[in-house]
Design a protein with these regions (language model features):
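N-terminal active-site beta-alpha-beta segment that forms phosphate/nucleotide-binding
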Residues: 1-99
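Conserved phosphate- and dinucleotide-binding cores of soluble alpha/beta proteins
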Residues: 63-67, 74-209
Length: 209
């Protein structure tokens, strides 16, 4: 027979599951921050791209461990999430250099490591803010190791991957309209996994293989 529960019991069950999920997420975040701090040596210069709560946690954890380092943060247009992350990091006394996105190629040579987040990860690519592939290519050319930080629940078989190149609000880039003007405002793109030196997860630092 089908077991029935009262509305109150259902609410309590849902609340417990939510708390359990939140606790697991918090523990995963702490582990990722600790593992990620291992890839940053004292006096290193870290470049980031876009914004990631995990990358932010790693940098704050590294700062609290006593290591001295600086972070190069591209502004990440059009929503400027990089700028906002840099300001949050400064509040935690993490030294940051904020640059325009177009200056990434000029500053990548100064970095010892490139650290990014991920929105989704498939069997062969990592989905993140558009521009991630470009900065990864620059890092590879400069022999700068590239790491991505994400929880393992970000893995998603490619066949279930949402449309990556969906157009977003063109007014975020240009509010002027013209029949001859097409505004391309795409948020996400895929970067091959073999571009990366390693992945920082709650289970440790793993290689692309």
């Amino acid at each position: 027979s089908v077991q029935t529960v009262s509305v109150e019991e259902a609410k309590n069950l849902i609340s417990r599951e939510i708390r359990r999920y939140q606790n697991e997420n918090e523990k995963a975040l702490e582990r990722i921050a600790e593992f990620g701090s291992q890839i940053i040596s004292g006096w290193d210069t870290v470049m980031t791209y876009s914004a990631s709560s995990l990358v932010e946690a790693i940098l704050i954890c590294t700062k609290r461990s006593g290591k001295r380092f600086t972070v190069i943060v591209p502004e990440s247009r059009p929503m400027f999430e990089g700028t906002r992350m840099a300001l949050r990091l400064c509040q935690q006394e993490v030294k940051c250099s904020l640059i325009v996105d177009a200056a990434i190629s000029k500053f990548i040579d100064r970095a010892n490591v490139l650290l990014v987040g991920a929105d989704r990860v498939t069997e062969d690519t990592l989905v993140n803010k558009v521009g991630t592939r470009g900065v990864a290519l620059l890092a590879k050319a400069a022999s700068v190791p590239i790491y991505a930080a994400f929880e393992t629940d970000k893995f998603l078989p490619r066949r279930y991957l949402p449309v990556v190149d969906r157009q977003q609000d063109p007014a975020q880039i240009c509010e002027t309209t013209d029949q001859y003007l097409t505004v391309q405002n795409i948020y996400f793109e895929e970067t091959p996994l073999d571009y990366f030196f390693g992945f920082v997860t709650e289970k440790g630092i793993v290689s692309p293989e």
